[in-house]
């Protein structure tokens, strides 16, 4: 193990997904009162910490490719942003590009309107429109699926479940012209039947919240919420790597 300023990390990252490669789960960036909304200045501090501590942001595709002999940079970390809020374009993307960092954005395809005049507002937040989703992809960001309508999948009939999982991927791939290989379970709802539908739809992997593991369809993430300081993030990442190392990662 090696140490940067008190942060213990595995010097040899495990090729198994989610073990030794922490995945951070963000939602929104802004000034509202939602506890899952991170303030812009907090995101700045977190991204600056990752950069100064020598972390390299990678995509989920790069992590899974490592299972097949692909190479990951040292001290890899995955940044993910769920739901596809407009701040992904206005707040997150500029900050990532400024630092040469990358992230995975999980999009609710049914919430993406064609233009700003018809932009969807839900949960008191505005969502991306299709040209903004394309701009994320064109900037080198990874796009994943978060279903068509952000429903609790275990409550749906088999046909509706399959449609939510399958149609979102198909729509995103058709619009972007590139593969969409990763899925995020809405509400962390991942029953055995839901997982089977995700696998059958052709995804390579899926992410959950804190109740996950290193399995490629239940990849665990660390929840980022309002109030997390760089010192807090240092502790979270240290604990993640300690666990992976102890388990043989």
Predicted stretch roles:
Residues 81-82, 145:
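Active-site flanking residues adjacent to catalytic metal/cofactor-binding acidic residues
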Residues 16-80, 86-91, 155-249:
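C-terminal active-site subregion of NodB/CE4 polysaccharide deacetylases
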Residues 32-33, 113-118, 151-156:
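A short acidic, helix-capping loop that chelates divalent metal ions and anchors anionic groups
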Residues 5-20:
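Bacterial Sec-dependent signal peptides at the C-terminal "C-region" and cleavage site
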Residues 25-29, 108-109, 146-148:
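Short loop/turn segments at strand-loop or loop-helix junctions that form parts
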Residues 100-123:
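A short, conserved beta-to-alpha structural element at the edge of catalytic cores
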Residues 142-150, 186:
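Histidine-centered catalytic micro-motifs
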Residues 94-101, 126-144, 199:
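Acidic (Asp/Glu)-rich catalytic clusters
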């Amino acid at each position: 193990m090696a140490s940067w300023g008190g942060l213990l990390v595995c010097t040899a990252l495990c090729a198994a997904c989610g073990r030794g490669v922490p995945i951070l789960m963000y939602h929104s960036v802004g000034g509202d009162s939602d506890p899952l909304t991170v303030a812009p200045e907090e995101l700045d501090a977190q991204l600056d910490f990752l950069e100064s501590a020598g972390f390299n942001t990678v995509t989920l595709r790069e992590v899974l490719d490592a299972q097949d002999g692909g190479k990951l940079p040292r001290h890899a970390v995955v940044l993910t942003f769920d739901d596809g809020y407009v701040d992904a374009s206005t707040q997150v993307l500029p900050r990532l590009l400024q630092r040469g960092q990358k992230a995975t954005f999980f999009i609710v395809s049914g919430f993406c309107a064609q233009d700003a005049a018809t932009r969807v507002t839900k949960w008191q937040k505005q969502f991306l429109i299709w040209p903004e989703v394309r701009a994320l992809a064109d900037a080198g960001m990874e796009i994943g699926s978060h279903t068509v309508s952000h429903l609790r999948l275990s409550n749906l009939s088999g046909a509706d479940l399959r449609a939510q999982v399958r149609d979102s991927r198909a729509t995103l791939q058709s619009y972007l012209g590139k593969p969409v290989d990763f899925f995020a379970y809405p509400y962390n709802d991942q029953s055995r039947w839901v997982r089977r539908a995700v696998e059958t739809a052709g995804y390579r992997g899926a992410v959950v919240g804190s109740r996950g593991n290193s399995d490629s369809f239940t990849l665990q993430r660390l929840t980022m919420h309002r109030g997390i300081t760089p010192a807090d993030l240092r502790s979270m990442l240290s604990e993640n790597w300690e666990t992976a190392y102890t388990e043989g990662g």
